[in-house]
Amino acid sequence: MLAGRPGAQSAGAGVGAGPPDAPGARDGGGRPRPGAYLDMKIHLEKNLEEERQMLLQQQKLCRNRARKYFMESNRRRKAFEEKRQKQEEREYQIRERILQQRKQKFEEVTEKFQRAHVPVSQRRRAVFQNPVPPLEEALKQIQESNLKSEVNIPLFHRPATNWRAIDSALPSTLSKNDHKHQKHLVRRINRNKEMKENNIANLATNKNVFQLKLEETQKLLEDQHLSDLQKFCDEVNQITNSETLSSIDSLEAGEREEIYITLSMKPSTSTQQNSVPLQSANLQAAHLDCFDEDKLSFSKTQHINNWLTNLDAQNSQPVASFSDILIKSNVLPSWECLNSKEQNPPALSRTVGRTTRTTSDSMVFVCSPSVVALDKKGENTAESNVVRASDPTEGAVQRERPAQMESPTFKVSRAWTTAESLTQETASFSVQERPSELTWESRTASIPASSVTVLSPNLQAGGPLAENNTQIKEIDPVQCSDKLDELKNMEHERINHLNCNKEKYLFSPNFQTTCALQNSNSNDRKQKESGPSAALCNNPPDCDLPEQHSIKHSVHEQNGVRLLKSILKKESRYEHNYLRALVMKQGFKFRHQKAETVRDSIELTKQKGKGAEISKTSKKLRWFDESANLENAVDDCHPVRNRAGMAPRWLQRCHTNSGTYNLTSIPECPVHSAAGKKAKADSVPENATDLGRYEIDSVPLNSSVSLGFSFAKQAWSACRRGESKAPVHASDSKTQKTKPQRGVKFTRRTGSSKVQKGLVQNRKPTVSQPQTSSKANTVAQTQGKLIITHPPPKPPTNIKSGKNMQVSPGQSAIPEHSQNVMTQSCLSPASVLPTEYHLNQGTQESSLPFSDTCSNLPAVSPALPTPYSSECQTLAKANSNGTAFLKDGAVYCTHRSPVCEESYQSFTHRNTEEESILPWRRRINGHQNERTTDSTVTRRKQIVENKWKRLLEQKRKTSGSIGMKYTEQITHFGQNVPPSTTEQIQAPRGVKTEEVSDSTSEFLVAENLMNSSVPEDEILTAINSKHLQKPNLSQPTNVCALSAEEQKILKSLHHLDERLYYVQEAIRKNPSIKNTLQLIPLLSSQPRASLSPDVGSTVQRKY
């Protein structure tokens, strides 16, 4: 502030010195101007002064802010300290209390123990008192306790404490009395708090009681006021019914008789001026002069009319007080009140016509809503809503409601289009009456309006009527004028306005939709209102509308119940007889919903069915996905789909490359699932490669069967054999007793799998692959879980193309379209057949039909000129119970493994025109089971040898049998067919596969079918159907020219080779038996390749 003073002085000096220096600066010319320096100095000083002031202000603000912050921080610090102290005190008290309780319990226990030998009567009673603490602790406790009590006690309750006396007192006495004193103080404090709380509560209750009494008094006063007002209204009613108002001459009485007759007999005559609302501005101008003269008289008459109206609908409408009507009429006339609502009229207008009869005080009171329907011919219109006194002596206004069944049809064709005719009728009616009778002094309604209402007032919605009855101030306009011209004009205006606004007030204001009301007794009609003055359309009814429905709807509308919507479809569709209201262009359309309800119900049922199908499909798809290969997921994993255009390329590659290709087809959609039906129709028209899987990377060291894949036992009874007899038969029922190996989890899936018959075509005669229950039996083991499925239905014998064949993941299924080419799951040449290639283990006790499995495994493989080709050759083994049959040049071999351990089926697919065959390999060595003992391996070996010896002997004996009958066909049509085992075949585990010619397999199939008691004609049928279809993969051109005897010799050699191979595998798997089986030096080499190109069989073994 001090620094600002010089600046201010210098600024003032500068300002004063400025004007004298300016002329000097101008006069200087070229000489230096001293005034410029002065101006600069003044400018700088001003700037500095301003900055100084700003800095000072900022400094003040900062100081104030710092002061506030400091005060706030101090306050918070104090509050925090207080809070912390309170917390500490509370914790200390809790600790002390707990310690005191513990000490007391300890003393009690000690006393009991020490005084156990003393009788109970002589024992000292335990006195709960604190032990005597040391002197320092006692003083400290006393001081702290007194401080606490002084802090907690209010000032007026705080006792005067002599601290010196307390300090000098003995610690023992103080320690004893301290807690007692503290307890006493605490009790006093609590008592004082309770008293204060009680006082506050008493004050609140007293206040509430006073308020309640006041409210009750006010209610009583209001009730008294209302009762007085009611008495006044009664007096007014007496005045209304007195002789002065009811006295009429004979002419008026005659007119009323005519009017009554007109109302009841001929409503279409001149009294057809229906209830006209007083809502027009023209009416306002027309009636303006009438009501300016005598407002009081008008108010009385208006009140009387309102009272009559309230009697008309007294069950649901409030009664307007006469004082309110006086106030309202004095403030705003009735037409003004109504005209103010013209833009959004919520209420039904009523025109009150009143007639009195000479014989009694009763009245004929006609009231009608603004929405009416006029009948051109006047049929059944006067009966719709006429209020008249049925008993002249009662003086009560009663409502005569017509029987609503009597007028089902109500013509409204000219209801709103005859404004001119109505006007003329009104004019003629007005002429008939005398002007003197229309005077205001008569207090009578000379022109009662015939009420032709669509809905009677008690059927109207409650909202509009409530507002009307409190504000119905209409009097017949005739009462207000002595001139016929005015009457004509007003009637014309009334009719015109009727045409404009009559149609708008059917529903309560919450509908917000102007609609043309249709008669509750008439047929349902759709009436649209294009504008405020549009005429009603005479449209035919959309559908039948019984009267009770309309009545029901009207009653609902009166009670405020809206049945226009429901939970689902915004309408009460579940109510059988409810009529649906459709709002269309400010109109309502009522009709029944029976047909639509039925249709919607059907649609809902269909939707539910679709939902169920979808859920089932998803479940079955999940099943297929669960059973899918880990690496060859059926739907969305590594396998690449080969589309239709890529089939020739794969086939060509099969011709050229030396690597082995597993030409199989894995269906995208399982046949077990419901979705398989659609997938069959979609995928079959494509080439078979569309459903194939290219498995070079996904299965590097295995065949298309995944690492954890296995086939489990058949899960259904022998009754399935009868269902699936042709062309392939299920296994024997005795094989159902198999048990899964412990440690392997079998999951049973229920699902109906379609049994199908596959047709495979590939530029050569087709090979028929009948699909049977193997689709439900092909069980995949993924991640240690074996999924067993239920048997499928009976296989159809002739299923057209257009269906898919399902194989468990890793296997291949052939699409059955006759023009499809079998897709191949291609394995890399280097990894398809390693030296330690192993077939899948045979299903232990598996009743899975080998023929069934074969139906899923179309095995047609290209030439395998690799060193592994001999390894790929397999021997088709069958038990005495096994089944084998020939079908169209293809051998169906069936065999089983009885050992109840991990069961795996292996399928080897052979091309009868090729030497080498790509077998279905099982897993790599790490996944093979090592549990089988030496005795089990030896037993298997012996059983296999015995079986094959017996089978070869049977074949030589039955050289002219069915097997030999089709031997020459096999040389040309070789198809490696999966086994339909009804017998158990044991293969030493771990033994590698070898090949057997198709002639042997053919014979074995036929023999197995014979052993399984299959009729010969069915065997022939199966073989013939198989013969009609050729394997159509890339086969070499060198056609086999070996005879059946040569093929027998070759098969015998291959049989020996395979036996050696089994022994080798057994030794490799079980080194403990090496000493007994080291007699064969050929074990170190692979088996020789088959010399016959038609070698084709399937081997199922257990390892």
UniProtKB/Swiss-Prot annotation:
Residues 1-12 have a biased composition (Low complexity). Its main location: other. One of its GO terms (biological process) is non-motile cilium assembly. It is found in: Midbody; Cytoplasm, Cytoskeleton, Microtubule organizing center, Centrosome; Cytoplasm, Cytoskeleton, Cilium basal body. Residues 43-116, 182-222 form a coiled coil. InterPro entries: CEP126. Residues 763-784, 798-812 have a biased composition (Polar residues). Disulfide bonds: none annotated. The keyword Coiled coil applies. Residues 1-36, 380-409, 723-812 are annotated as: Disordered. It holds the Pfam family K1377. GO terms for cellular component: centrosome; ciliary base; cytoplasm; midbody. Residues 736-748 have a biased composition (Basic residues). Keywords: Cell projection, Coiled coil, Cytoplasm, Cytoskeleton. Residues 723-735 have a biased composition (Basic and acidic residues). Interacts with DCTN1. Participate in cytokinesis. Necessary for microtubules and mitotic spindle organization. Involved in primary cilium formation. This is Centrosomal protein of 126 kDa. It comes from Mus musculus (Mouse). The gene is Cep126.
